[in-house]
Structures are given as structure tokens and as C-alpha cells.
């Protein structure tokens, strides 16, 4: 496939993922389908959330931990200070997906691309994750590109639904 990426009216020509401009990375964040594969098992939750903040120079060392605790609690992982110290293997799939959502929110993006974020979760957890997306859309004035095969989830969350033929 081919195409162009425009952000605020500017063409963001990208040939490789490492060439993606920092402005784009801050403005557009991803939440991936697999909560088990999107977090590195050797790092704590704190590391996963702190890394983008350090990279974009958004928080200093003293601001970092309280902000991460706040993010974790915002996505329903309480107490946040306990979750910040956990490793991915110590959490359920739903908890891991909440960490991925918190990481995406950490940079205060304008757009989140969520690629099948509920497909690998238990049915009992899916609604909780959809509620988090709905809440953050309203609270953060956020655009969510929610990619799914589940039309009921799309109908619940979306203002507009686009169905791709052979996509």
C-alpha cells in the first residue's frame, strides 16, 4: 500500500520508523493489539511510561513518579505507585493494555491510533477498556482512530464508522 501522512496540513514523509519526526511521535500515539507483546518484560511499568517522557523532555526526575502514578490511576490501575513498580509478567492482559493506554496518554497526544485494542482481552475486560477510551476522548479532546472487526465496539465508541472492503 502507499499514501501520505499529513499532520496539521504538513506532509510527514516517512521512509522508516526511526525517521519519524519527534513532533509526529508526540502528537500521534499507538495502542497495539497484543498487550502481551507491546511491553518489554525486563522493564518495569515505570520504565515504560518514563521513557517517552524523558525522550521528549516533558518531565524532570522529581515530576516523573507522581505523574506516572497519576496516569496509571487515570486508566484504573490503583494504587498507581504499586503498579509502577510491577513488571509486565506480574499483570493480566487487561492491566497490560491499560499500561499501554497510559503510555499513549503520557505525551498528551492529539491522536491515538488503537489497533484492535480489545481483541485479545476477556469479554469482561473489553467494556472497561472501551470506557477508558470514551472517557479520554472527552477529557483530553482526543481523536481516537479505533481499528476493529467488532462493529458493536465501534458503534459504542465512534462518532463515525468507516468500513473497509477487503481491508
Q: Which residue stretches match the model-derived regions?
A:
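ABC ATPase NBD coupling module
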Residues: 11-29, 47, 55
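Conserved ABC ATPase signature
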Residues: 86-91, 95
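Hydrophobic anchor residue at the start of the ABC signature
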Residues: 101, 129
Amino acid at each position: 500500500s502507499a499514501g501520505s501522512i499529513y499532520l496539521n496540513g504538513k506532509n510527514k514523509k516517512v521512509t522508516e520508523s526511526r525517521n519519524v519526526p519527534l513532533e509526529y511521535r508526540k502528537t500521534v500515539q499507538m495502542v497495539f493489539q497484543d498487550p502481551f507483546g507491546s511491553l518489554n518484560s525486563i522493564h518495569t511499568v515505570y520504565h515504560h511510561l518514563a521513557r517517552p517522557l524523558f525522550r521528549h523532555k516533558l518531565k524532570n526526575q522529581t515530576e516523573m513518579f507522581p505523574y506516572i502514578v497519576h496516569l496509571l490511576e487515570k486508566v484504573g490501575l490503583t494504587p498507581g505507585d504499586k503498579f509502577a513498580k510491577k513488571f509486565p509478567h506480574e499483570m493480566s492482559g487487561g492491566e497490560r493494555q491499560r499500561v499501554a493506554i497510559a503510555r499513549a496518554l503520557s505525551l498528551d497526544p492529539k491522536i491515538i491510533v488503537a489497533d484492535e485494542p480489545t481483541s485479545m482481552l476477556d469479554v469482561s475486560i473489553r467494556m472497561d477498556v472501551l470506557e477508558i477510551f470514551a472517557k479520554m476522548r472527552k477529557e483530553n479532546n482526543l481523536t481516537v482512530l479505533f481499528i476493529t472487526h467488532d462493529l458493536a465496539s465501534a458503534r459504542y465508541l465512534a462518532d463515525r464508522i468507516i468500513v473497509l472492503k477487503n481491508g
